[in-house]
Design a protein with these regions (language model features):
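Conserved C-terminal guanine-recognition region of P-loop GTPase G domains, centered on the G4
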Residues: 120-135, 146
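NTP-binding/hydrolysis catalytic cores, primarily Walker-type P-loop NTPases
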Residues: 189-214
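Hydrophobic positions on the alpha1 helix immediately C-terminal to the Walker A/P-loop
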Residues: 18
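Beta-strand-loop-alpha "switch" segments that mediate conformational coupling across diverse proteins
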Residues: 149, 159-188, 202
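Inter-motif core of Ras-like GTPase G domains
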Residues: 95-114
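P-loop/Walker-type NTP enzyme "switch/lid" segment
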Residues: 2-3, 7-9, 13, 22-97, ...
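Hydrophobic anchor at the start of a short beta-strand
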Residues: 32-33, 84, 139-141, 169-170
């Protein structure tokens, strides 16, 4: 059993995209998954409602207004599913901290712009706070280079910039048309464009996260 929180203090960095597609890839590895959407705007729920694929079966909203109740529900889900994903909204530090306090792994997507790096630093501080409160062992914290344009200098240097913040960096996810098109249909990339570069990137990321959990 593992609880995986995807957090960040800035919007538009791919948190929901990574949550959805990483959960899909974990399911293909044989895991029973649950996906929790804590965003008041219900981004993942809205995505799932666009189609009748994987997300429509596994995404559920969960209110964080009452932390004790939230914790109880997450733990209950974790007993039924061996990979529980928590997608947190941007700019809501309380929700992100709450998720991090429950998580085995905190994933921090970050884009290549200077503002993205600053936001990643803030998200890292919060994740480390959660780890300190839990005795310094968990959650494991990893950056994910997200929405990367590999042909630009910013894109090429993103992994290095994130490593400089002091935590390990997982394989990147590129800025891919297939990702956006899949979301418009309510599907994950694996469902929409199996065998695509985007799908392969998420498969590689899932294997890296799986190794971390083991």
């Amino acid at each position: 059993m593992a609880i995986i929180a995807i957090t960040g203090q800035k919007g538009g960095i791919g948190k929901s995209t990574i949550t959805a597609n990483l959960a899909m890839e974990m399911a293909t590895l044989g895991h029973k998954v649950a996906i929790i959407d804590t965003d008041p705007q219900k981004s993942l729920v809205s995505w799932a409602e666009l189609g009748e694929g994987f997300l429509s079966k596994y995404v559920q909203p969960l209110d964080t207004t009452h932390p004790v109740t939230f914790k109880q529900k997450v733990i209950a889900l974790a007993k039924a599913a061996d990979r529980v994903f928590i997608d947190t909204p941007p700019g809501f530090a309380d929700q992100a901290l709450l998720a991090a306090l429950l998580a085995d792994v905190v994933l921090l997507p970050a884009g290549p712009s200077p503002l993205d790096i600053l936001a990643a630093r803030a998200a890292l501080t919060l994740a480390r706070d959660a780890r300190a409160r839990r005795g310094g062992k968990k959650p494991f914290v990893r950056f994910i280079p997200s929405r990367v344009t590999f042909y630009t200098n910013l894109g090429k240097g993103l992994s290095s910039s994130l490593e400089d913040l002091g935590e390990k960096v997982l394989p990147p996810i590129g800025q891919r048309v297939a990702i956006a098109e899949a979301a418009l249909t309510g599907l994950t990339v694996l469902e929409y464009a199996p065998g695509s570069v985007a799908s392969e990137e998420f498969a590689t990321l899932a294997k890296a996260v799986e190794e971390l959990i083991k």
